[in-house]
UniProtKB/Swiss-Prot annotation:
GO CC terms, sorted: preribosome, large subunit precursor
Residues modified to Phosphothreonine: 353
UniProt function note: Required for initiation of larval growth and normal mitotic growth but is not absolutely required for general biosynthesis or DNA replication. Required for progression of normal oogenesis and maturation of some imaginal tissues into adult structures.
Protein name: Protein Peter pan
Coiled-coil positions: 295-350
Protein's organism: Drosophila melanogaster (Fruit fly)
PROSITE patterns registered for this protein in UniProt: BRIX
PANTHER family reported in the protein's UniProt record: PETER PAN-RELATED, SUPPRESSOR OF SWI4 1 HOMOLOG
Biased composition (Basic and acidic residues): 323-355, 401-446
Pfam families the UniProt entry points to: Brix
Keywords, in A-Z order: Coiled coil, Developmental protein, Differentiation, Oogenesis, Phosphoprotein
Sequence ranges assigned to domain Brix in this UniProt record: 28-290
Family label: Belongs to the PPAN family.
Length: 460
């Protein structure tokens, strides 16, 4: 037999766990979902965008068709979610919405082009990607968002607030392994989004030495010694171009990678890991996907039209509040009516009436001016119990008396249930005709069944 199974303590929920650090709680968290028509490419694009937002996003979030936006909004406060990205696939176009939870504003973009991460990586010669790159938030780079329009400032602020801010005085340079670029083109009004991995390489070394430091050494079959490989640059890859001097920086900290020391020059290289997005800002709404339209790219309205729309929105809001109030009152009234009906049915089942004899007597006295007769309004004795109360000794039945063990074990008085006699030989009882017994024959003289020998012989 197996031993006793060990009982492990249950893992408790987040409410019972130790409190999270303030850096994680205050960091902007996000939900990225997709709605609309089913499309496998949109699902992959949603997963790739979640990859960009890591680690402060729900990477394994599973949304269903029955889920609504308000379901995610109701959970946002519990999980410290500040932003939500929504990819919506329609029959004619793909849109991307960025919502600031829980009260807005909401930015709606039209997606002109997109490329999945797997396609971008397959096109690159060097695939510089590692799971350790996604343990920290990326660096956000904004380009050309310094325009006159307020919508540009709001758009730039929204993109920056989607990622945690970086304190230059306390940041660890080794944790910056990725960067996200948002570039705005004022001529076409398009926003280009790119995602890169960051690689830091020491400067001032020959190509051969750099390869030895990195640990990627080519075929040395033609070399007699390592010195031949170092002194001759012909063995290095010709496809590698020289580093641009603009990418050279002096490191303020020593990195874990080989050759990157403090106060030494290093070169920063970017490798695109995808996805790519080309989108255009269409609309900015004040509320959570509703409310006043602050900016629209296609429709331009005058101040009078805006004021009319504000009044219309305010009117609809008041009507909605009034309907909610009326619904709450109707619900309370219906509950009260049901409760009264239930109580009246209970009183009717108990044989009671709503009228009280004392009240009837008072009413008679006020109307007639005389005392009513005693027999007119009789006070019936009210019983609070449906059944009469029983005494203490009558609540339970008396127990049966136990048989004496001597009488129980006496074999002489006991009858054997297997000791059977033929029912035709019994004289103590008058035999009757049994229609089920085919061997018996009825005799009308003595009114008793006789045994038929012919049938018994035939059966043999």
């Amino acid at each position: 037999m197996g031993g006793k199974k060990k009982v492990h303590p249950k893992t408790r929920t987040a409410a019972f766990k130790a409190s999270e650090p303030s850096e994680i709680v205050e960091a902007p968290h996000s939900f990225v979902i997709h709605r609309g028509l089913a499309c496998p490419y949109i699902t992959d694009l949603t997963l790739d965008f979640r990859r960009i937002m890591e680690p402060f996003t729900a990477s394994n979030l599973r949304e269903k068709r029955m889920n609504r936006i308000k379901d995610f909004v109701s959970l946002s406060s519990f999980f410290h979610v500040s932003h939500m990205g929504i990819f919506n696939k329609a029959s004619t176009q793909l849109s991307f919405k960025v919502v600031r939870l829980p009260r807005g504003p909401s930015l709606t973009f039209k997606v002109h082009q997109f490329t999945l991460a797997r396609d971008v990586i397959s096109l690159s010669k060097k695939q510089m990607i590692d799971n350790d790159h996604f343990k920290h938030a990326p660096l956000v780079i904004m380009n050309n968002f310094s325009g006159d329009g307020k919508h540009l400032k709001l758009m730039a602020t929204t993109f920056q607030n989607m990622f945690p801010s970086i304190n230059l005085a306390t940041v660890n340079i080794g944790t910056i392994r990725r960067c996200v670029l948002f570039s705005y083109n004022p001529d076409t009004k398009l926003v280009e989004m790119r995602h890169y991995s960051v690689q830091v390489v020491p400067v001032g070394l020959k190509r051969a030495v750099q390869k030895i430091v990195k640990g990627t050494v080519p075929n040395l079959g033609k070399c007699n010694e390592v010195v031949d490989f170092v002194t001759k640059d012909g063995y290095a890859s010709e496809s590698e171009a020289e580093d641009d001097e603009q990418s050279h920086v002096v490191l303020a900290q020593t990195l874990k990678s080989k050759g990157n020391l403090e106060d030494k020059k290093s070169s920063i290289k970017l490798h695109e890991i995808g996805p790519r997005l080309t989108m255009q800002l269409i609309k900015i709404e004040e509320g959570l996907l509703t409310g006043e339209v602050l900016y629209h790219d296609h429709v331009v309205k005058t101040e009078d039209e805006k004021e009319t729309l504000r009044k219309l929105v305010e009117k609809k809001r008041k009507q909605k509040e009034q309907r909610k109030k009326e619904q709450a009152e109707n619900r309370a009234r219906n509950l009260k009516l049901k409760k009264d009906e239930k109580w009246a049915a209970k009183r009717a089942a108990e044989g009671r009436t709503d009228s009280d004899p004392e009240d009837d007597a008072e009413y008679y006295k006020e109307e007639v001016g005389e005392e009513p007769d005693e027999e007119l309004f009789k006070m019936e004795a009210k019983s609070s119990r449906k059944r009469p109360s029983l005494g203490g000794g009558m609540k339970y039945k008396n127990k049966r008396a136990k048989l004496d063990t001597k009488d129980k074990n006496d074999k002489s008085e006991r009858t054997d249930k297997y000791d059977r006699k033929d029912k035709f030989d019994r004289k103590d009882k008058k035999d009757k005709f049994d229609p089920k017994n085919r061997r018996a024959k009825f005799d009308p003289k003595n009114k008793r069944a006789k045994f038929d020998h012919r049938k018994s012989r035939k059966s043999k």
